[in-house]
Amino acid sequence: MAVSSCSILGGCPRIFPSFECRSDPDFTGHFQSEKQKTRGFSGQIHGFSGQSLILRFPPNFVRQLSIKARRNCSNIGVAQVVAASWSNGPIASEEKAIGVVAPVIDSSCNNNNTEVVQSEFTDSNDSFLSSDGSLAVHAGERIGRGIVTDAITTPVVNTSAYLFKTTAQLIDFKEGRFASFEYGRYGNPTTKVLEEKISALEEAESTVLMASGMCACTVMLMALVPAGGHIVTTTDCYRRTRIFIQTILPKMGITATILDPADMDGLKSALEKHKVSLYFTESPTNPFLRCVDIELVSKLCHSKGAVVCIDGTFATPVNQKALPLGADLVVHSATKYIAGHNDVIAGCISGSKKLVETVRALHHVLGGVLNPNAAYMIIRGMKTLHLRVQQHNLTAMRMARLLEAHPKITRVYYPGLPSHPEHHIASRQMTGFGGVVSFEVAGDLNTTAKFVDALKIPYIAPSFGGCESIIDQPAIMSYWDLSPVERAQYGIKDNLVRFSLGIEDFEDLRMDVLQALDSI
């Protein structure tokens, strides 16, 4: 309990319970929303009623409350409920604020008679944030005017397990009456903030984070496709995903139809011929940046009861929102644009609560948990997501046009160009075309390698979506173990280059590319 030395009403001292105090030093807001009322406490302090009016906080009261919450509520889930209750509530005049009645709650944080409500930490309302830029900065971290703790930045919670005050509290948690965490593999407060942030950007009900994009893809496929089931996917995709679909899923009796991204007749035929459980594709795809008509595919698949999952890694939630277009799930390698700094590996799946919880259940069994320190780094990276993506989009578009006009480049693959086979689709369902440009150099493997080696700014490396520009020859970086004939089956030519444009100044990149082309 916290006692204010300056709250006297009719000569009666007022006792402030920690649960009910708002982190609001100017005392301009309500203390508690109506839904967070408690019951079961009828005691009085030294004869004074627990329902007196609160007048004002001492100057250092907020800081003391923050410390007391962490000391008294050693269960982090409870502490977040407490912190959320301090911060929540609409702005009100001081006259209205003075009149708010604050019920007293046992400061030990384990009153078994307390009505438990879901923490707004796990069910935040970001409706006052109207743009992707604001959501990327604040979603998941803002609770009304405040935040989940008194810190501006979300803290990293490094723990493998979470305690319960009593057995009764544990039972309440198991039966859904008490919001908290149990074991590190099942959830973490820092990771939860990141999940809420991604959900807000994707307009999803729920998101689950995993240790990598491949982890997210494989767990999703195993969770949603039954043994003996059938999936439809596309020819152009990340090679490791294709390997899993073609070599691992058959061991579970799962078969696949592999189609060109634009082959809608083939999709209709597969839906008629098979009981398709899932349609899964990237859009744009890797490395040719093909774009699937998400709205049309979703209508066709839903008519036959199939789930649609779109890998939107190349697009980002800023450039494309697959769920409003009709997809059921969207998966990302958060390693790429979402984290955006080439320093963390992660994956995520967003969609309806029902489907995501099905995936989450298997994820809890298999593991592949994202470290909370990595989650924090992604949260930090996402605060500049919209700014980075704008720069990626602009630089890539300008580079694609430059390359398409250059005599030493035979073909450019970029959905923002009218020459791209799905430009009309990309223009309809994307607000930007991303930061990756693939192209073919006029020459063989060695000529192309000479061009790549002559570049001074981009790093020769795998991955994409970071601040630094990265370039590679897929024939060498991703398909070197296959013969040229086998590579050709996937459209991978020796002169193909995948260029991930970073956030460097375009003029520097332009001059670098031109001098490298001059060298061949």
What are these regions (language model features)?
Residues 2, 14-38, 44-113, 156, ...:
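Conserved N-terminal alpha-helix of the aminotransferase class I/II PLP-enzyme fold
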Residues 2-14, 107-128, 133, 138-148, ...:
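Conserved PLP-enzyme active-site core in the AAT-like
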Residues 14-52, 56, 145, 408-497, ...:
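Conserved C-terminal alpha-helix-loop-beta "cap" of PLP-dependent enzymes
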Residues 126-130, 136, 140-181, 354-357, ...:
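Mobile, glycine-enriched helix-loop/loop "lid" segments at the mouths of ligand-binding/catalytic clefts
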Residues 179, 205, 345, 374, ...:
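Short amphipathic alpha-helical segments
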Residues 194, 359, 447-451, 509-513:
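Hydrophobic side chains in well-ordered alpha-helices
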Residues 203-204, 230, 494, 502-517:
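Well-ordered alpha/beta subsegment
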